[in-house]
Amino acid sequence: MDLLFFDIGATLYGTDASQVLRIDRALPEDLTLAELGLPHRGNRAIVFDTPEGEAHLKVDAVHGVRSIPVNSLRRMPPTAGAAAYAVGVCLEEARTVLLIDLVETARTQGRH
């Protein structure tokens, strides 16, 4: 599976690269989500499609797309009580990276 890795604040996240339309400059009204942490600068935005049109998530850095073996991915169990946008984790080298669904992230903010 191809994942896009990015930073919000000091935290590394990943998302399904097929959800991403492009990386752009961030605008003041772009989406931030306190639960993911606030960007230090938030100069970049991940642009993705929602049923209502494009949405933008502010990020600090984009690390690019990497193909990750499926056996390195874990779904978030329903009993974990995680937010709807937290779909799983990626076991990346010596750390665990939270994988988020961009469309669910926008819905969390009422931007759907």
UniProtKB/Swiss-Prot annotation:
This chain's function reads: Necessary for proper aggregation of cells to form fruiting bodies. FRZ genes define a system of signal transduction analogous to the enterobacterial chemotaxis systems.
Q: What are the record keywords, sorted?
A: Chemotaxis, Transducer
Please name the InterPro entries in this protein's record: CheW-like_dom_sf, CheW-lke_dom
Which superkingdom, per the lineage? Bacteria
Q: Does the keyword Cell division apply?
A: no
What's any GO biological process attached to this entry?
chemotaxis
What species is given as this protein's source?
A: Myxococcus xanthus
Recorded coiled-coil stretches: none
Name it. Answer: Frizzy aggregation protein FrzB
